[in-house]
Design a protein with these regions (language model features):
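Hydrophobic transmembrane alpha-helical segments in integral membrane proteins
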Residues: 1-19, 149
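Membrane helical hairpin/interfacial module
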Residues: 17, 21-28, 33-92
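Hydrophobic transmembrane helix segments
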Residues: 60-68, 196-202, 264
Length: 270
C-alpha cells in the first residue's frame, strides 16, 4: 500500500478550497450575480479566510518533504513542479492580498481582478494536478482524469464556501440561486468520481490497487449524496437557515478529505 502523507491531504484540500472559492465568487461577481452582490460587504472576511487557508496549505506542502528547507531549495529550479506550485500559490496570495487590502479600505474590489485571479487559480489547480499526472510509475494517477478530479473538487469546495457566505451575509431570498450552483457542483463531482472509478477499474492493469470500498461508500454518503440532498431541499424552499449552509460545507469538507485519502492510497508504484 502507498504511504499516506496527511500533509498532502491538507495541502490539496485547502488549495482546492482557495482556488475554487475564488473561481465561483469571481465569476459570479463578473456576471453581476444578484445573490453575490450582497456578499460584497463581507468580501474582506472572505479574502482573509482564503489567505489563511492558503498559508496553511503552503506550510503543509513544506512539511510533507520531511525537511521544510527543501521547499525553499526547490526554487533554485523554477521548472520543478514543487517550485511551480509555490510560484502559482504566491501569485494567488498576491491576488487575495490586493483584494483584501481594497476591501479593508472600503473600496469595491475591481472586476478586473477577478479574471486575473481566476486564471491564476486555474493555473495553480493545473500545476497541482500535473504533479501527480507526471509522476513516473504511478498508473492510478497518470491520466487526464486526475486533472478533471482536481478541478471538480475545487469547484465543489468553492461552491460550498460561497453558499455559506451567501447564507450568512446575503439578503433573504437569494439562497435558492446559490443552492442551485451548489447542487450543480455536487453533480459535476459525482460524474468526475464515476469517471475516476472507471479509470481505476479498467485503466490500471500493471499494479494491484488497494480495496477502498468502505471509504468510497462513506465518501459518497457524506460528501456527495448528503450535500446533494441539502442543496436540493434548499433550492426547492424546504430548507432554510444558516445551519443548512454550515451542514453543506461540513459534509463537503469531510467528503473531499476522504476522497483525497482514497486518491493517495491508490498511489501504488510500479
Amino acid at each position: 500500500m502507498a504511504e499516506l502523507n496527511f500533509s498532502l491531504v491538507i495541502f490539496t484540500l485547502l488549495i482546492g478550497l482557495c482556488t475554487g472559492t475564488f473561481l465561483i465568487y469571481g465569476l459570479g461577481r463578473l456576471r453581476n450575480n444578484s445573490a453575490l452582490a450582497a456578499v460584497e460587504k463581507s468580501s474582506l472576511l472572505l479574502m482573509v479566510v482564503l489567505l489563511i487557508c492558503l498559508g496553511v496549505a503552503l506550510l503543509a506542502s513544506a512539511t510533507h518533504l520531511g525537511k521544510p528547507f527543501r521547499f525553499m531549495n526547490a526554487f533554485h529550479n523554477p521548472g520543478s513542479m514543487i517550485a511551480q506550485e509555490g510560484l502559482w500559490s504566491m501569485a494567488l496570495g498576491v491576488t487575495l492580498l490586493i483584494a483584501a487590502l481594497m476591501a479593508f479600505k472600503g473600496k469595491i474590489i475591481p472586476k478586473g481582478l477577478y479574471p486575473v485571479g481566476s486564471l491564476v487559480s486555474c493555473g495553480l489547480l493545473l500545476v497541482c494536478s500535473m504533479v501527480y499526472v507526471k509522476a513516473v510509475g504511478f498508473p492510478a494517477w497518470s491520466s487526464g482524469v486526475t486533472i478533471i478530479y482536481y478541478f471538480g473538487s475545487a469547484i465543489l469546495l468553492g461552491a460550498a464556501v460561497v453558499f455559506l457566505f451567501s447564507m450568512l451575509h446575503g439578503e433573504e431570498g437569494t439562497e435558492k440561486n446559490l443552492a442551485f450552483t451548489a447542487l450543480t457542483a455536487v453533480f459535476l463531482q459525482m460524474i468526475v468520481s464515476v469517471a475516476f472509478f472507471v479509470h481505476l477499474k479498467f485503466g490500471v492493469m500493471d499494479v494491484t490497487l488497494p480495496t477502498t470500498l468502505g471509504m468510497d461508500l462513506l465518501r459518497w454518503g457524506i460528501g456527495l449524496i448528503a450535500p446533494a440532498v441539502i442543496a436540493y431541499l434548499t433550492w426547492s424552499g424546504k430548507l432554510k437557515g444558516k445551519s443548512v449552509a454550515w451542514s453543506f460545507l461540513a459534509c463537503v469538507l469531510v467528503g473531499e478529505a476522504i476522497s483525497r485519502v482514497i486518491f493517495f492510497m491508490q498511489g501504488i508504484h510500479l
